[in-house]
């Protein structure tokens, strides 16, 4: 928001390492603002100040998944905070995805979804509070997100058009618990405190590529 242009450059250093550099363009050339290894990254205004923050997903020195949030201070991009995320970077690099949108409270958020062993989706919900990145769904006891269910090729999205992103939570159908061809999906929204609420339920015929929005009261009565 300062009228200057920045460029993010990512490149593969080796088979197992990618690097990311942020440059600002000036009259006499470019100047490096930040350098990090990464698996995925996202750029978004997370605190409504008109400036977009940079979030970098990478593995720390122990191999644990980490999210680094870079903030603008006096024209310089600086590391503001780092937090744990649920997934390993090996998992995130495959079918993982970052979705940028808002919570029920209109708070900007990053939904980081990992697919473990191609069978289970785990989603972290990251927000910026007082300049500190926060994972709303990370359990202090287990160290992983409580938002986890069977993966059926669905990712967080605004499923009902209310302007809020919902997280898909797979619920096995009675009599067909092992099948992935058809699923009931509960779509979960969050507020800025991390409080979850079900927005709606859908029936998804995954292999056929269609879904049905379930009327209120139908969800518990659907069988395979």
Q: Positions of the model-derived regions?
A:
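Beta-propeller-forming repeat regions
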Residues: 1-224
């Amino acid at each position: 928001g300062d009228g200057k242009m920045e460029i993010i450059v990512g490149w593969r250093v080796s088979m197992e390492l990618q690097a990311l550099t942020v440059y600002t363009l000036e009259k006499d050339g470019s100047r490096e603002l930040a350098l990090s290894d990464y698996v995925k990254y996202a750029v978004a205004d997370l605190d409504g100040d008109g400036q977009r923050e940079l979030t970098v997903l990478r593995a720390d020195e122990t191999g644990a998944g980490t999210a680094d949030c870079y903030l603008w201070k006096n024209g310089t991009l600086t590391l503001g905070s780092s937090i744990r995320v649920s997934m390993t970077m090996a998992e995130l690099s495959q079918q993982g995805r970052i979705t940028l949108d808002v919570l029920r409270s209109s708070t900007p958020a990053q939904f980081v979804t990992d697919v473990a062993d191609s069978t289970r989706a785990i989603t972290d919900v990251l927000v910026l509070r007082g300049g500190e990145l926060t994972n709303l769904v990370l359990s202090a006891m287990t160290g992983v997100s409580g938002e986890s269910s069977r993966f059926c090729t669905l990712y967080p999205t605004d499923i009902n058009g209310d302007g809020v992103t919902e997280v898909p939570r797979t619920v096995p159908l009675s009599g067909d618990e092992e099948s992935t061809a058809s699923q009931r999906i509960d779509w979960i929204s969050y507020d800025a405190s991390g409080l979850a609420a079900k927005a709606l339920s859908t029936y998804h015929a995954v292999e056929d590529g269609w879904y049905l929005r379930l009327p209120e009261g139908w969800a518990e009565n659907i069988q395979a």
